């Protein structure tokens, strides 16, 4: 297999292919808005007929939104579920219960039906864009409010089956890349800072040897208005940006040989491996991103590296394998898992081939 075989193959259209503000540290922003229809039981208590009626009512409301496509749960194949999992839309667990989902043409906003709540609206954007996401999702919410009656009260706000989601029903979250904070042993201080402000932090790649990508999110939606929550997330994101960049500067000054060794080792691995599993790609991308930020290398953009976290996942690679013809070495051409690892290595090498060390 040669790198030239995939140079003309377009990637699946999605939000993560675009650059965003401050995306050296804040890889992406996410917003979730939950709603329940008035006069219907929560999903956990709803009958099959209730769920069908809820689904029908919400689908009718979406009928005039041509930019959304509806996908029934029963119509999602194993491959389709893998694609949706790779895009952080659905888990792989077949027991994950829902009726269907609406997906926007840009794949940056989707609506999940009958999963714990009657309706979950979720949107993504590259970089640090919580305010933009809030504006986008509330445009859709305002439209739906004109078509649907949502369950709410003056005392508790929007009513949900999970008490922590009552109130605004909104949760903002950020995916952050903080290798310098971790390497400089300041991660524990960050956890305390977040906990004191009622935020949680979770590793994205739990099997990674060097965890440095995390999701941060509020513990509850109940405190404050939407604008209060937005202001808090903006302040938190700004703090993380300043903290990581401060430790990045210290890292460059005090650990230059160690960091250069790590970056070059991962570069050599990425450029010479014939087979790569996803955990190895995580390590390579983390190191190359750090090298780019420290000025060790050039020739590749933050947005390209951020997109590779998604486009090297199994679902995207299976899509390429199913839709294009590639030539494989004789000993792997009959093994899909080996073809995926081989193609993953080629995708990484195509992107990294432009890198220049300074």
Predicted feature locations:
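Long, Pro/Ser/Thr-rich low-complexity/intrinsically disordered regulatory tracts in eukaryotic proteins
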Residues: 1-155, 162, 170, 184, ...
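Short glycine-/aliphatic-rich beta-strand segments at the starts of folded cytosolic domains
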Residues: 172-178
């Amino acid at each position: 297999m040669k790198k030239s075989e995939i140079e003309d193959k377009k990637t699946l259209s999605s939000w993560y292919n675009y650059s965003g503000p401050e995306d050296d540290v804040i890889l992406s922003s996410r917003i979730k808005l939950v709603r329940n229809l008035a006069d219907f039981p929560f999903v956990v208590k709803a009958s099959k007929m209730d769920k069908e009626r809820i689904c029908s009512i919400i689908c009718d409301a979406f009928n005039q939104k041509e930019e959304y496509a509806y996908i029934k749960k029963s119509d999602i194949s194993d491959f389709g579920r893998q694609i949706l999992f790779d895009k952080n839309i659905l888990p792989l667990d077949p027991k994950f219960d829902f009726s269907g989902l609406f997906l926007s043409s840009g794949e940056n906003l989707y609506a999940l039906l009958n999963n714990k709540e009657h309706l979950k609206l979720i949107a993504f954007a590259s970089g640090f864009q919580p305010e933009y996401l809030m504006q986008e999702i509330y445009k859709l919410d305002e439209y739906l409010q004109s078509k649907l009656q949502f369950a709410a009260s003056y005392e508790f706000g929007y009513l949900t089956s999970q008490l922590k989601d009552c109130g605004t029903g909104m949760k903002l979250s950020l995916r952050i890349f903080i290798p310098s904070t971790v390497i400089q042993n300041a991660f524990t201080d960050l956890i305390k800072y977040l906990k004191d402000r009622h935020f949680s932090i979770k590793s994205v790649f739990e099997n990674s040897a060097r965890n440095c990508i995390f999701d941060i999110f509020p513990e509850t939606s109940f405190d404050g208005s939407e604008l209060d929550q937005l202001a808090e997330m903006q302040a938190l994101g700004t703090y993380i940006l300043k903290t990581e960049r401060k430790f990045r500067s210290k890292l460059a000054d005090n650990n230059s040989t160690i960091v250069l060794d790590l970056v070059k080792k991962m570069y050599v691995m990425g450029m010479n491996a014939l087979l790569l599993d996803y955990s190895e790609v995580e390590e390579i991308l983390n190191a190359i991103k750090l090298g780019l930020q420290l000025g060790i290398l050039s020739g590749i953009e933050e947005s390209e590296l951020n997109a590779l976290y998604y486009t090297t996942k199994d679902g995207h690679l299976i899509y390429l394998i199913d839709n294009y013809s590639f030539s494989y070495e004789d000993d792997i051409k009959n093994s899909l898992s080996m073809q995926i690892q081989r193609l993953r290595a080629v995708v990484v090498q195509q992107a990294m081939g432009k890198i220049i060390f300074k």
